[in-house]
Amino acid sequence: MSRKLCTLNFTLSGKQGSLVIRDIQLWSNRPTASKSTSELRGQFIQYVDLAKLPLWVRSTNMNTYRCYSTSATAQAYFKSKLRNANRGIVIELSDKVDQRSQEPAYLIIFRENTELNCFQVDLTMKHEFDGQVTKLKQEIGKTRASVSKEGSIDIIIQQSQQRKIGTKTKVYRNVHINDKRLQFNETLSKLILGGLRLRGISNSITDYQKLYKITFDAAEFTHRDELKRISMGSXEEVSFESLQETVETLLKLFTKS
């Protein structure tokens, strides 16, 4: 039997100020010790691709909660932002912390078919990884401190390995940059083609290819600063919403009768 666990309110911060998404009820099918419901407060952090999350984010036995809301604002927000199947909304809880690390706790809200669900990010495995990395660094530090002149060959081998790792890292960085640019081009192309279809512009029309190309080039020029930073290795990405708004604006301009 489902039971209401709590109600979540979280804040969105934007150019026009803050907006609070209210009355998100979290329900569970699992029995819980507490019979009272609480109210959680949170802050929107970012959107994520669920398919690209690290394996440690979700454990196999973690609870997934159903989300409901009677708020028209909340319903409209989730409908707009969770149209993509693999998209998730990361919320940092203001009044709840991870018991092990005493760091902020996080919820990820996502849509599964027609249902709205959420789960709390499991930081247990991450802490284990961090502990192992710290231990390994300490052991490496002790080993380096005890290296003598007779062990100089080990230093030479280590330096050679570090150079190889540096080369691999540079290759990986270039591949990552190319992937981001390719993703930008693919998303931009789909948005333009979709926008042309919505306007009833068929590819049989004489100026179809010309309209597609000038829209593509103009969108690239609009986001030239972001693309330049991406080419320099920045982790920045051009958001889907920003690119969609650019394409819509350009198509309205170019298709005026």
Swiss-Prot record:
Give one Pfam family.
Answer: Sld7_N
Keywords, comma-separated and alphabetical: Cell cycle, Cytoplasm, Cytoskeleton, DNA replication, Nucleus
Gene encoding it?
SLD7
Q: Which family does it belong to?
A: Belongs to the SLD7 family.
List this protein's GO terms for biological process: DNA replication; regulation of DNA-templated DNA replication initiation
List locations, semicolon-separated. Answer: Nucleus; Cytoplasm, Cytoskeleton, Spindle pole
GO terms for CC? cytoplasm; nucleus; spindle pole
**The keyword Nucleus appears for this protein:** yes
Give the protein's biological function: Required for the proper function of SLD3 at the initiation of DNA replication. Binds to SLD3 and reduces its affinity for CDC45, a component of the replication fork. Required for mitochondrial morphology.
Q: Record's superkingdom?
A: Eukaryota
- Quaternary structure (record): Interacts with SLD3.
Keyword Cell inner membrane set for record: no
Indicate what this protein is called per its UniProt record: Mitochondrial morphogenesis protein SLD7
Q: Which organism is it from?
A: Saccharomyces cerevisiae (strain Lalvin QA23) (Baker's yeast)
* Organism classification: Eukaryota, Fungi, Dikarya, Ascomycota, Saccharomycotina
